[in-house]
């Protein structure tokens, strides 16, 4: 068992108090950072472990939502997401790493709000929106830069400056395009466009 798993089991055996709940939430973040670090190392280790195939989005998204369910509850975040069986042509493992970063940011910077996840079949794009603190317009062009945490990251002291940089690299690996719209105090939307050639060629 990993130290994280052991710590989680010990916390589960303890009486639920505010401190224990806080520690359980922090364990989710720690596990997320570990997953991010492992994905980061694999990404730059020149591994050719791509498996481009037809992937059901629900099977990628639902495990991520389950991992972060405690934070959804703790931060009083409503989730708008419908399992529809939509499929895309991509690599499931790398897509999961990409989506986890975006979803974890959404719940990290949203309180008493909502997160919405939807798929536009016509445009072959996944949209992840939140009603969180938003991103300053001057920060948006830089959020995918390595080490850049922006004003919100410095304010909340929760940003590694690596997550969205890794998202950009994975997106390039998967031939995915990402657009971002955001307004401070109103929230952010990430538009994830899947490769049209993959869809047309069925590869």
Question: How would you label these PLM feature ranges?
Answer:
Residues 130:
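Acidic ATP/Mg2+-coordinating residue in the GHKL
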Residues 135-148:
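Short conserved segment of the HATPase_c
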Residues 45-50, 87-93:
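Conserved micro-motifs of the catalytic ATP-binding
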Residues 174-176:
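Conserved glycine-rich
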Residues 114-124:
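Short beta-strand/loop element within the Bergerat-fold HATPase_c
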Residues 148-158:
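Glycine-rich ATP-lid/hinge loop adjacent to the conserved G-boxes
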Residues 106-107:
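Short helix-loop "hinge" at the ATP-lid/N-box region of the Bergerat-fold HATPase_c
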